[in-house]
Amino acid sequence: MVTIRADEISNIIRERIQHYTKKINILNTGTVLQVGDGIVRIYGLDEVMAGELIEFEEGTKGIALNLESKNVGVVLMGDGLRIKEGGSVKATGRIAQVPVGDAYLGRVINALATPIDGRGEILSSEFRLIDSPAPGILSRRSIYEPLQTGLIAIDSMIPIGRGQRELIIGDRQTGKTAVATDTILNQQSQNIICVYVAIGQKASSVAQVVTTLQEKGALQYTIVVAEMADSAATLQYLAPYTGAALAEYFMYKERHTLIIYDDLSKQAQAYRQMSLLLRRPPGREAYPGDVFYLHSRLLERAAKLSSKLGEGSMTALPIVETQSGDVSAYIPTNVISITDGQIFLSADLFNAGLRPAINVGISVSRVGSAAQIKAMKQVASKLKLELAQFAELEAFAQFASDLDQASQNLLARGQRLRELLKQSQSAPLTTAEQIMSIYAGINGYLDSLELGQIGKFLRELSDYLKVNKPRFQEIINSTKTFTEEAEAILKDTIPSEKDRFLREGKI
C-alpha cells in the first residue's frame, strides 16, 4: 500500500505556487457583421484606433478606417474570400508598418513589401510605419543641389533639385512614364536610390518598365513597388505610402533618393472606391473630402534634410493623368497646388513628333535656377528667352502672309532649338552633352543645317568631343562652370565638325 507523505505533497504544492506566473491576455475582439466589396463591418472592437491593423481568424488583415457608434468599418488588405459573417476578429494594437532595408534594392514587391518577382524572400530586421509623419520645418533645408534627369528640356528650363516635388502631368499616352524611367536611368552614376511605384497599372506595362531597368543596369539601385489594376483598392491606396517608407529609410541614412508615383490619379480613384463603400459622404467628382490630405501627407514626406540630420534627400516625381488636357479637374489642381512645379506633357506635341512632348511654355519649376549648376545657368537663360520669342512669333506667323527677314531668321532659329530638345527614349544625356547642344543652338551653329540633320550632327559632335576633346567634359564635371577654356573648345570644334558633316552629307 502506498503511503501518503504529507510533507512531500506540501513541498510540491509550495513549489508550484512559487513558480506560478499570473498571465492574463486581454484581447480586443469583435464579430463580423457584414463582408463584401473589400469592406467588412464589425461589431465590437470597442477600443480600436483609427488606422489600426485588424486580424481575422483565417489570417487576412485589414485596416480600421471608419469608427462608428454601432460598428467599425474595415478595409481588407487581400481578397477576404474566406471571411464569414459571425467570424471572430481581433485588434492587433499596431499601426500598419513595412520592413525596410538594403535587401530590397533590385527587387519587385507589392504594397505589403512582399516580393512578387519570384526570387525568394527578403530578410529584413528594420520596420517603418507606412504612414510616418513628414519632416518638420527645422528638419529641412532649402534645395540647392540639382537632380539631373538627362532630358535636355527639363535640365535646362524646368530644373529639378534634390528634395523637390515636381509633378509630371498629361493625357494618357503622352510619355509620362518614359520621362520618369529616363530619369531613373540617368541616376546610374549619381549614387541615387530610386523607388518606382506602379499604382493600378497593367501588369504588362510594369513588366516593360522592369525589363528596361534590368537591360540598362538600373534595377540594382531601384526598388519597384507594384499593385496592378486587378489588386484590391486598399493595396492600390497603400502602395505609394509603402514606396515612401522605403525611400525615407535611405533618406535618413544620409542617402539621396528619387521616388516616382505612377500615377496618383489611380490612387485617388482607389481611395474614392473605398470611401464610397464605407458610406463616407462624397464631394466634388464623388471624391471624399479628405482626398487633398491623402496626397499632401504623401508628398510632404519628400524633403532635403538639414545638415544635423545628414543632408539626405527624397525627391518625388508624382504623375497625374488628365482627361483631354483638362488641368482644372479636381485631382490635377490638388496635386499642382501641393508640388513645387509641374512638367506638362502635351498630346498635340507628342503627335507632332516632339518627344519628350514637354510644353515648355506652361511647365514650371518653383525651385528654379537654385537647382542648376552654374554652367547650365550660363547657357540655358538665352535658350528660354529665344524659345519664348519663337512661340509668340509662330502663333503670329499663322495669320501673317509675309514676314521680314529678321522674323524669318527668328522662326528658323526657334525650329532648330525645338529640334535639339528632341531625344530618343532611354537615352539620357550628360550635362556636358546638354551644354554643348544648347551652345550650338543659341549661337547659330545649327542655322545652316536642315531640321532632319540636327539630331545626327549633335550625336556625331558629342562622339567627337568625347574621343578627341575629353578636356571639355572634365571642365564641366569638375568646375560645374562653363569657363572660357570650355567655350574656346566648342568655338574651335563646332565649325570644323559642321563643315566635315556637310561635306560628307553631299558625297
UniProtKB/Swiss-Prot annotation:
Q: What does this protein do?
A: Produces ATP from ADP in the presence of a proton gradient across the membrane. The alpha chain is a regulatory subunit.
Q: Write out the catalysed reaction.
A: ATP + H2O + 4 H(+)(in) = ADP + phosphate + 5 H(+)(out)
* Mode of membrane association: Peripheral membrane protein
Biological source species: Cuscuta obtusiflora
Key word Disulfide bond present: no
Identify the NCBIfam families for this entry: atpA (TIGR00962), PRK13343.1 (NF009884)
Which CDD domains does the UniProt record give?
ATP-synt_F1_alpha_C, ATP-synt_F1_alpha_N, F1-ATPase_alpha_CD
Q: Which UniProt keywords apply?
A: ATP synthesis, ATP-binding, CF(1), Hydrogen ion transport, Ion transport, Membrane, Nucleotide-binding, Plastid, Translocase, Transport
Q: So what family is this one in?
A: Belongs to the ATPase alpha/beta chains family.
Q: Which GO terms describe its cellular component?
A: plastid membrane; proton-transporting ATP synthase complex
Gene Ontology MF annotations: ADP binding; ATP binding; proton-transporting ATP synthase activity, rotational mechanism
SUBUNIT field:
F-type ATPases have 2 components, CF(1) - the catalytic core - and CF(0) - the membrane proton channel. CF(1) has five subunits: alpha(3), beta(3), gamma(1), delta(1), epsilon(1). CF(0) has four main subunits: a, b, b' and c.
Q: What is this protein's gene name?
A: atpA
Q: What is this protein called?
A: ATP synthase subunit alpha, plastid
